[in-house]
Design a protein with these regions (language model features):
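N-terminal cap/lid segment of alpha/beta-hydrolase-fold proteins
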Residues: 28-70
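Primarily recognizes the serine-hydrolase "nucleophile elbow" in alpha/beta-hydrolase
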Residues: 128-202
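Short beta-strand element of the alpha/beta-hydrolase
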Residues: 72-82
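Catalytic active-site module of serine/aspartate enzymes centered on a nucleophile-bearing elbow/loop
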Residues: 290-312
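Short amphipathic alpha-helix adjacent to the substrate-entry channel of hydrolases
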Residues: 90-108
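Mobile cap/lid helix-loop segments that gate and shape the active-site cleft of serine hydrolases
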Residues: 36-44, 55, 198-236
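Short beta-strand/loop motif that positions the catalytic acidic residue
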Residues: 240, 246-248
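Catalytic histidine neighborhood in serine/cysteine hydrolases
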Residues: 266-282
């Protein structure tokens, strides 16, 4: 500590930034070590590496699974986390396959990270993926009017933003299939920040060594409040939004409970809820017990709002 005090100010900033970033990296979701039964995966057909959007030479890909049946099924997009600056779609592969085995077409997507392209590129990619699935609904036997989304951490934020920002032109992007809607019909946001205009995020983004919000959005909340509003799921809430549930680990920050956002949803008459996984951390999918709780709760919510509500 004494050596740290002797450092010049600019080196202190570099040191603190590195320490903050390494801590954050350690807390971000990693590819899940949870196991799936061989007979489960054997019952699925897979379509890896599908190009859902292209920007110049940059191809955006997704991996898709579905049961080996010709019956049209609801779809669920699974979005990985990583602080918007890291992560891979493979981190959500086990959850996607487990949901597919329950009777869904599922897709894990890659999106442009903040080191490549800042907001709104990531959400524009998510919307492009929805439009791709609708365009190819007949090919993959998807019920085009029953598409859900889930995600963890940064992916949870993007899932919630996807759910609440239907029709917001600035977020649509030019990823193709513009004739299709990017709306979704149900969302489970996990470990997600749903209010980017709150005081907590204002304080976090004001720190020069903030590796998340300033990197993702371009500056602090105080400097660009309009961008934080545009990126905030809560900011876009209205009566047209789909059912939106939240899930988080008991040991995660209380902000992921989305208390104010859920209160707003309730006032609007939109189904919502909170699943709190006991003794679970932020990146809870890597533990089998937590994974099982997540799968059960997610599938129950999606079944109610993507399957049961559409039965004649």
């Amino acid at each position: 500590m004494r050596l740290f005090q002797l450092l010049p100010p600019f080196l202190k900033v570099i040191f603190l930034t590195s320490a903050w970033t390494l801590t954050a990296l350690a807390q971000q979701p990693k590819p899940s070590p949870t196991k799936l039964a061989p007979e489960l995966t054997a019952a699925l057909e897979s379509h890896p590496g599908l190009v859902y959007a292209q920007y110049g030479e940059r191809q955006m890909q997704l991996d898709l699974w579905r049961p080996k049946t010709a019956q049209p099924l609801p779809a669920i997009i699974c979005i990985h986390g990583g602080g918007w600056f890291k992560g891979e779609r493979s981190a959500m592969a086990n959850l996607a396959q487990a949901l597919a085995a329950k009777g869904y077409v599922t897709a894990t997507i890659s999106y442009r990270l903040s080191g490549e392209s800042k907001f709104p590129s990531a959400i524009q990619d998510c919307k492009a993926a929805v439009r791709f699935l609708r365009t190819n609904a007949a090919k993959f036997c998807i019920q085009a009017d029953a598409i859900g989304v889930t995600g963890l951490s940064a992916g949870g934020h993007l899932a919630a933003l996807l759910a609440t920002s239907s029709g917001v032109k600035q977020l649509e992007g030019d990823g193709g299939h513009a004739e299709q809607s990017s709306s979704v019909q149900a969302c489970v946001a996990m470990g997600a920040q749903s209010d980017l205009e709150c005081t907590r995020i204002s304080e976090l983004s004001s720190k020069p060594n903030d590796p998340f919000y300033r990197t993702f959005l371009g500056d602090s909340q105080a400097k660009i409040p309009q961008i934080y509003a545009l990126a905030s799921p809560r900011h876009h809430l209205d009566q047209s939004d789909p059912p939106l549930a939240f899930m988080t680990g008991e040991l995660d920050d209380a902000s992921t409970h989305a208390d104010e956002t859920r209160a707003d949803l309730t006032k609007l008459g939109i189904p919502t809820g909170l699943t709190l996984i006991p003794n679970a951390p932020h990146a809870f999918l890597g533990q089998q017990q937590n994974f099982n709780i997540c799968l059960q709760a997610s599938e129950a919510f999606f079944a109610k709002h993507l399957k049961d509500s559409r039965k004649p």
